[in-house]
Amino acid sequence: RPFLILRQIVQHLGSGRTELVDVPAPGPRRGRLLVRTTRSLVSLGTERMLVEFGRGSWLSKARQQPEKFRAVLAKIRSEGLFATVSAIRSKLAQPIPLGYCHVGQVLDAGEVPGFAAGDRVVSNSPHAEVVSASPAFAARIPESVSDEHATFTPLAAVALQGLRLLDAKPSETVVVMGLG
């Protein structure tokens, strides 16, 4: 393995603290792409929202995610207040990796058809030196596309999925709000 420890950007949802941490490097796995990062893009809208969410109070978090708040109330009714608070604290104590606009070079293709070591790929993987990428959310990058330009692919995919959900027709006009 070329890397034993790598650096990754994570956020602690309980405190809102974002930091660069040393984590064990993923190893080769059948059905996964092991990718060394060459570029990673920060989505100002989505990632800023996540950082601000993490910095918010418990009340703020509940207001932003009413469906999870309802699940918490149901858990209190079924398991009690102490067990529910313990579960929430445990969940908020787990750092989450940030990022989803990733470009890199395949180190190990994990026997995934259509990919080989050395391929340049774009994926929805987090900001880290080496990632284990899902082939379902990865694509080979054409030679004519730079790594820098390829990092924008996941942002375009999010917009495209929005259009699919909207079921917009080519003749229709749509308004995009949020820009991130």
Language-model features, listed with the residues they occupy:
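Short structural boundary motif marking the start of a folded domain
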Residues: 2-9
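Short glycine/threonine/proline-enriched tight-turn/helix- or strand-capping micro-motif at secondary-structure
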Residues: 16-23
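Glycine-rich beta-strand-centered segment in the early N-terminal region that forms part
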Residues: 26-41, 50, 54-124
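A glycine-rich, Thr/Ser-enriched phosphate-binding loop motif common to dinucleotide/cofactor-binding enzymes
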Residues: 98-100, 124, 142-167, 177-180
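Flexible, gly/ser-rich surface segments that form the specificity/activation loops bordering the active-site cleft
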Residues: 125-130
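Short, compositionally biased
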Residues: 131-145
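Conserved class I S-adenosyl-L-methionine
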Residues: 172-176
